[in-house]
Amino acid sequence: MWGMIATWRMAHDGVLAAKELLEGQASCKDAVETAIKAVEDYPFYKSVGYGGLPNERGIVEMDAAFMDGETFKIGAVAGITDVANPISVARQLSDEKFNSFRVGQGATEYAMLAGFERKNMLTDRAKKIWEKRLAEIAASNLDPYDGHDTVGVVALDTQQQMAVGTSSSG
């Protein structure tokens, strides 16, 4: 028996891909990473990964964490930039004996040295939304944030092991 749950509708396609893995006896760790990568790669989610909204300076800074329920290992990145899949970096960091949480430039440098894909995460769509928001701020005509935020995934595999992951464009 296996199981999986994720936050928000935006994770649906990733959960379906991960479901195939779990049905094929894959590990919960692979399932969590697969599900979250699907969300990170989709350019129309403005709160996670590629297409996520940039910060005040126009830079897409992302956060991700990965936790292994069997070993209690954790890996995390915060403020990472120009990396295609922060969840994959966080997962690899969970296997590091020391310094399993990297922030900002240190997170990005770790990812580049480890061979992760460098990618400009700012899409034209996200840039336009950001520019509109800057104009609203200047005009003091603000509305509450519209949309969902961080994606979170929990998976249990057929070996009764559990893993958890989360990703956000901060």
Residue spans for each PLM region:
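Alpha/propeptide regions of enzymes that mature by internal proteolysis
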Residues: 1-170
